[in-house]
């Protein structure tokens, strides 16, 4: 039996569709939204809709942006011969927090995972190859997560890029195996970047 009104039930149901949100958390969020001032609820709804309508892939690196080319790719002070490949837009933010990396990025939006049915064609590898054929690079640093999927992706990329005459390196594993890049602190990421190795 459903104890909530149709509107509350629908709100709870929508929150449960978010990753990591179970029924109890969805209920707490729903009641928080219901109890907030109406203007705050409108602002939240508007922010969600604007993000969905305006966010797109950067034409250069495939990071998420509301412009044709993201702020990082627009920054001419960066080293154009150095590209860091990451799995997720949040990894770009994590790397930028170190203030150590001065090149550009390429965001794959995932990692190769045969068990989940994710192959190379399902992530932004083709876009990376097109980019590298049009723009020269001395080194590509692969900063995928240190788990099975990240390692598989790194090895696959290495096999594709080495014949192009590009130095391919992998960030060092100051990051725990099985961990996510976005949760690593700046010092750990800095050390991992400094200790990268060629693959």
From Swiss-Prot:
GO terms for biological process: DNA recombination; DNA repair. The keyword DNA repair applies. InterPro entries: DNA_Rcmb_RecR (IPR000093), Hlx-hairpin-Hlx_DNA-bd_motif (IPR003583), Rcmb_RecR (IPR023627), Rcmb_RecR_Znf (IPR015967), TOPRIM_dom (IPR006171), TOPRIM_RecR (IPR034137). GO terms for molecular function: DNA binding; zinc ion binding. Keywords: DNA damage, DNA recombination, DNA repair, Metal-binding, Zinc, Zinc-finger. A zinc finger (C4-type) spans 58-73. Residues 81-176 form the Toprim domain. The keyword Transferase does not apply. PANTHER family: RECOMBINATION PROTEIN RECR. Belongs to the RecR family. May play a role in DNA repair. It seems to be involved in an RecBC-independent recombinational process of DNA repair. It may act with RecF and RecO. This is Recombination protein RecR. It comes from Alkaliphilus oremlandii (strain OhILAs). The gene is recR.
């Amino acid at each position: 039996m459903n104890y909530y009104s149709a509107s509350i039930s629908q709100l709870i149901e929508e929150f449960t569709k978010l990753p990591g949100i179970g029924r109890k958390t969805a209920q707490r969020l729903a009641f928080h939204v219901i109890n907030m001032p109406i203007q705050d609820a409108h602002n939240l709804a508007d922010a969600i809709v604007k993000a969905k309508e305006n966010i797109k892939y950067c034409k250069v690196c495939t990071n998420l942006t509301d412009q044709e080319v993201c702020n990082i790719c627009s920054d001419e002070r960066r080293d154009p011969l150095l590209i860091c490949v990451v799995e997720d837009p949040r990894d770009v933010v994590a790397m930028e927090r170190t203030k150590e990396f001065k090149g550009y990025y390429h965001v794959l939006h995932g990692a190769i995972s045969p068990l989940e049915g994710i192959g190379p064609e399902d992530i932004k590898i083709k876009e990376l190859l097109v980019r590298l054929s049009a723009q020269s690079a001395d080194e590509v640093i692969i900063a995928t997560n240190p788990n099975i999927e990240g390692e598989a992706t790194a090895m696959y990329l290495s096999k594709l890029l080495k014949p192009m005459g590009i130095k391919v390196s992998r960030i060092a594993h100051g990051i725990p195996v099985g961990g996510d890049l976005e949760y690593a602190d700046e010092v750990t990421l800095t050390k991992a970047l400094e200790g990268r190795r060629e693959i």
